[in-house]
Amino acid sequence: MNNIIKMLNEEQMKTDVPQFGAGDTVVVKVRVVEGGKERLQAFEGVVIAKRNRGVHSAFTVRKISNGEGVERAFQTHSPIISSIEVKRRGRVRRAKLYYLRDRSGKSARIREKLATK
């Protein structure tokens, strides 16, 4: 029974998900259906939380839109996600960046992780 569940979970998982973590700036392209038409909607922001649970993995992205903070939670292996692109790597020391909710402006900036040689 356990092997069947594991096999079904592996079958539903996507293989083209890039490596990213909290502090990284990502662009998530989401399929949106409006009146019979399907289009891609991009949501760009900072990953403030990531949860790794196999097929149930999820992550939360935060962005500032018109001066207002907007957060959106995504299931990593969801069929509505077309692609995930990592724009920049952030250097943080926490796994969950919920403290960014209380900050704005320069104090909400995240240092960039420089590539090692």
Swiss-Prot record:
MF terms (GO), sorted A to Z: structural constituent of ribosome
GO biological process: translation
Entry GO CC: cytosolic large ribosomal subunit
Keywords for the protein's UniProt record, in alphabetical order: Ribonucleoprotein, Ribosomal protein
Taxonomy, superkingdom: Bacteria
Record bears the keyword Endoplasmic reticulum: no
Pfam families: Ribosomal_L19
Function: This protein is located at the 30S-50S ribosomal subunit interface and may play a role in the structure and function of the aminoacyl-tRNA binding site.
Protein family membership: Belongs to the bacterial ribosomal protein bL19 family.
Protein name: Large ribosomal subunit protein bL19
Species: Shewanella halifaxensis (strain HAW-EB4)
Gene encoding the protein: rplS
